[in-house]
């Protein structure tokens, strides 16, 4: 028996999928160890669309900054993991990787947090 082909729906356009990711840099920006505008510029230069960095696909990917939050909006498939990769690359470039980490605080956002160094362990060692 021959496989039955389903007729393709003609004229049916796909709904544009808009992806929106936020990066919350509140803590390091308030402490003055990081500049949100500099980070935004870094993302604009480094995000690749169709294998090309810097052009953001002619408006397909947009980056907006409001105080210390950066929002990346994309109309093409865009990975949240790629945003984390670029953030870590920025932190390494600015020698902040030893103090800050990138943590997902929701399905569509990342947050820069300080490493929590356990001070309780140090106190226990001093007591012994």
From Swiss-Prot:
Pfam families: Ribosomal_L22e. Keywords: Cytoplasm, Ribonucleoprotein, Ribosomal protein. One of its GO terms (biological process) is cytoplasmic translation. It comes from the Eukaryota. The keyword Ribosomal protein applies. The keyword Ligase does not apply. InterPro entries: Ribosomal_eL22, Ribosomal_eL22_sf. Component of the large ribosomal subunit. The ribosome is a large ribonucleoprotein complex responsible for the synthesis of proteins in the cell. Belongs to the eukaryotic ribosomal protein eL22 family. This is Large ribosomal subunit protein eL22. It comes from Gallus gallus.
